[in-house]
Amino acid sequence: MTKAIYNHDYFAELYCINNGDPWQYEQRWYEKRKRDMTLAVLPYPKFKNGIEIGCSNGVLSAELAERCEALLCMDANSTAIQLANQRLIHNHVKVVQGIVPLDLPTQQFDLIVASEMLYYLEENILLQLIEWMNTYLSPQGCIVACHWRHAIEGFSLNGEQVHQILKQRLHYYYYTQLQDADFFLDVWTHDINSIAAQEGLL
């Protein structure tokens, strides 16, 4: 396996747009609303050790950092890493450049976030990432995936296919889903009990 699995030129061109924010994370209400909904579906108020795979310029990461005692933010693009480092000036946040699945850490996490990046992967690479998730989610952990549900050009997978594969291959309890008109948002947990049950309400 080589680093050709990452389309360097595509993302290098993309991050030249809008000062490194080609999706306008900071300008669009759509993006702000989606971040708020992603944070709202997290089943626990705090996490010991989180990872965001494909952190981009760190806009979502900054809000995840408020929920994590330690947060690892990973992206393959050097411009994204530079921008994320400028934004995430917290002692408990680490930003690293790396390619999925080659550079994934071999440690457990109780929060794994993949937002708007899995459809960039070839299916065999996605399956390797899922295998990693099945190995390194801690017993009290959760996985959150959020992806655009409309057409995507130039890649072999779309958001719907990604979430179907996740549902088929993840070994965890499918805790909740939110099917917005524009995106899929799904959560898996290690614990099969609902939050109400965990807090003694049931």
What do the predicted segments below correspond to?
Residues 1-45, 49-105, 121-135, 141-202:
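Class I (Rossmann-like) S-adenosyl-L-methionine-dependent methyltransferase catalytic domain
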Residues 114-117:
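A short beta-strand submotif of the Rossmann-like class I SAM-dependent methyltransferase core
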